[in-house]
Amino acid sequence: MIGYVTLGTNDRARGAKFYDAICRELGVGRMMENEKFIAWGAPGGGAGIGLTRPFDGKPASVGNGVMVALEARDEDQVQRLYEIALANGGTCEGTPGPRGEGFYAAYFRDPDGNKLNAFCRPA
């Protein structure tokens, strides 16, 4: 259903470092790049994530209530994604752990304040 999500940044290099590390753990890389925009995803398609300075020239800001969820293989990968996020300028919004029956997640923000979550559905 979702093709890609684009997030705003005020520091493209800093944001690229963060998403390069996160996407490497997810097994995907940059699939599109120009001087204004970077997109990460699988070469054959599927959902992707983009990063850009806002096209209107105003500073990037965080959407209240907006969150991007990244599906992990298992609880260990949720933990790794959380650690990678914090090691690359992200901030904690909720440590890894169960969030109700059959749902395990960690919450964090990227260096620009965009909220993300890494999750899996353990058996």
Give the positions of each predicted feature.
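Hydrophobic pocket/interface hotspot
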Residues: 15, 19, 78, 85
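Long, continuous compositionally biased terminal/linker segments
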Residues: 41-80
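Structured beta->alpha junctions
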Residues: 11, 70, 74, 97-100
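N-terminal beta-strand motif that seeds the catalytic metal site of vicinal oxygen chelate
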Residues: 1-16, 68, 122-123
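Core segments of cupin and vicinal oxygen chelate
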Residues: 7-48
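Short glycine-enriched loop/turn motifs at secondary-structure junctions
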Residues: 1, 61-64, 100
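Conserved beta-strand segments that form the floor/walls of ligand-binding pockets within enzyme
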Residues: 4-6, 50, 67, 107, ...
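Vicinal oxygen chelate
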Residues: 26, 82-123
